[in-house]
């Protein structure tokens, strides 16, 4: 999975491209930790994410819980099978999807 970032005035956006699974979940966790060190408002753009596993979901919910109240994690452009997974697991309600 490739992760690119874009800084804006009040937000840092991470763009994910590929598959978020057991092998790549630690990569996202590290990228999110670094992002929240730089900015309190982080968006994760999933437009080019083809697949998400339970390991990837665990990273997103763990970071959401960790920053809740101290920062803001937004998930954007959730589509296709990734959206189906978010809805089936209830993560579409738990996470801040924009």
Where do the model's predicted regions map?
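STAS-typified acidic loop motif
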Residues: 4-28, 47
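Amphipathic alpha-helical interaction surfaces in cytosolic regulatory modules
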Residues: 22-94
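Short acidic-hydrophobic, aromatic-tinged amphipathic segments that line or gate anion-handling sites
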Residues: 96-98
